Amino acid sequence: MEQLSCKHRSSSMEAEAQLCRQTESRSTQLPRMSVMRHLFLLSITFLVYTLDSAKAYRPTETLCGGELVDTLQFVCGDRGFYFSTNNGRSNRRSNRGIVEECCFRSCDLELLETYCAKPSKNERDVSTAPATAIPPMNKQDLYHKHHHTKSSKYDIWQRKSIHRLRRGVPAIVRARQYRLLMQKAEESEQALLHRPLTTLPITRPLHLQQTSEPSHN
C-alpha cells in the first residue's frame, strides 16, 4: 500500500511539473509575439515615412532649349505655343516666361499646357462663313504671300525637332503617351464587347433568287 501511495504521489508531482512547464512556455511566448508585432508595425511606419519623404524631396524635372521646344510642340500640337504670355497663372508670375519657369525652377504638364496658344476668332469664323464671302486667290498671289512670310527662330527650332527627339522623350510626355495608349486600349475592348452577335447577309439566298426570276418572266 505504501508503494502504491508513493507511485501516486510521484505521478501527481510529474503532472504538476508538466503543467508548470506549459504555463511558463505560454507566458514566454506571449511577450515574444507582442514584440514581433511591435517590430512589424514599426517597420511599416518607417517604410511609409521614407516613401513620403522621398516624394516630397525628389528632384523636380526641368526642360531647357531644344527639349523644351520639342515638348511644347508635342503637348500643344496644331494649336501652337508662345513663350512670354501665360493666361493660366497669377499676375505675379505673368512676367515670367516658359524658359524661366521650366529651365530654372520646375516644369510639369499643367504648366506647359497653359502656354499653348488658343485658336483665334478669325479661324473659328472661317468655318462658319459662307463660301461666297471668301474671294478666290490666284496662284501668283499665293506664291507672293508665301514668299514674303518670315520664319522666326522658334519656327526653325520646330522644323529641327525630329533630330532632337531622337535623344529621348521627357517623362512628362511619356506619361501622357501612356495615358493615351491606355484610353485607346479601353476603347478597343469596349468595341469588341459591344460587337453584334449576328450580322444580316447582304445578298439574297440562292433559292430566293431562283424563285424571283420566273415571277418576273
Swiss-Prot record:
Keywords for this protein: Developmental protein, Differentiation, Disulfide bond, Growth factor, Neurogenesis, Secreted, Signal
Any one GO molecular-function label of the UniProt entry: insulin-like growth factor receptor binding
CDD domains tied to this protein: IlGF
Region entry D, spans: 118-123
Region (C): 84-96
Role this protein plays: The insulin-like growth factors, isolated from plasma, are structurally and functionally related to insulin but have a much higher growth-promoting activity. Promotes anterior neural development. Acts as a ligand for integrin which is required for IGF2 signaling.
Signal sequence coordinates: 1-56
One BP term from GO: regulation of muscle cell differentiation
Compartments (UniProt record): Secreted
Feature type site, description Important for interaction with integrin: R79, R89, R92, R93
Disulfide bonds: C64-C103, C76-C116, C102-C107
Pfam family, one: Insulin
Propeptide cleavage-removed residue intervals: 124-217
Region (B): 57-83
Record protein name field: Insulin-like growth factor 2.L
Family indicated by similarity: Belongs to the insulin family.
Protein origin, superkingdom: Eukaryota
Region (A): 97-117
GO cellular component, one term: extracellular space
